[in-house]
Every structure is written in structure tokens, then in C-alpha cells.
Amino acid sequence: ESIVKMQNWDKRADKESEAAGMYLLTYHYIFDKLNLGTEAFIEGMDVDNNLFIEAVAYANDHLMEYFETLDVTLGELQVHVRGDKEYGVNGFADVLAANYNMPYTNGKFKTFVADSYVQFAQWKDGELSIESLHPYGASNREWSEHYNDQMELYVNQETKKMTLDKEEIYANAEKIYHPK
């Protein structure tokens, strides 16, 4: 069943994909077993059928142990975590908007390397439009409301509007101060 699921997979690392979740566990097993690093994504690798079957069996066992089903999406298995927030997230190490993950808790993996600050600027008809995003939030202070307030936007691949217009910034500022 799991092999058929991966054979029919569209090869997209979407958080809603069960096949992507199965693939994540399978490639983690193979990379660990062969002591491979990220260069294997570039150089390629040979995996014999026996190792692949062994890796799929490992993935099945992992899903049954931690989730009690083989029908687990990538977003249930791979999460983006900061503070008390945890969201399922798209991506693998070798895709656009790539991320790397590591074992986390309860059979899950958490991202630890991914996109950083993202900004899109567009000039149209003499007008500037800016959208931005940080994978977590605009603060490293755990007590700040901005510590992890952009995570949901990030996992949904959305951005927020921003401006460089000083008057608009002052008009909408939560607080105006001068750093010491």
C-alpha cells in the first residue's frame, strides 16, 4: 500500500500529501543508513530495491507507532515550531522554498533551516507595492507578541503588506520610541 502510494505521488512536498509524509520518512531512513548528506540531492544516489523496501517498512512502523495509521500527511509529520505554536509545513530539502528538519517529539520532525526574511517589491504605474514575511516573527524576545506572529502566514505561503511611507508608518505604529 505504501509503495503504491509513493508510486502514484505527484512529487509535490505539500503539507496535505500523505505520500510526501511517507517519502520524508523513507528518505530519512536511507540517508541515515548510507550516511549521506545534502550533496546526495545534487549528485544522485543508487538505492537498491532491498534498501528501499527496508526504508518503506521503517516508515510504516514509524507511522503506526506514533500515529496508529499509515494515512498521515506531511503537515502532520513535519512541523514549524516556535514557542507554543506548531504548524504543519510544506517542503523538503531539495525543493523550491526548501527546508531541513530533524526529529522533534511524538514521531514528528521540526524544521530548523528554511527560508529567512522574504520581501517582494513591485513598481506599477509609479506606485510601489511591498509584501514581506518572516518565518517566525519580527522579534527574538519570547515575551513579545511578534515572537511567532507570522508563522501561520509562512506555512500558508502568504505575505503581509508593508510600507516605507513614513506618515503611514507613524499613523499605524503600535508604539513610537527611540532605541538607546
Regions found by a protein language model. Name each.
Residues E1-K180:
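Acidic, low-complexity N-terminal propeptides/linkers enriched in Ser/Thr/Asp/Gly that mediate export
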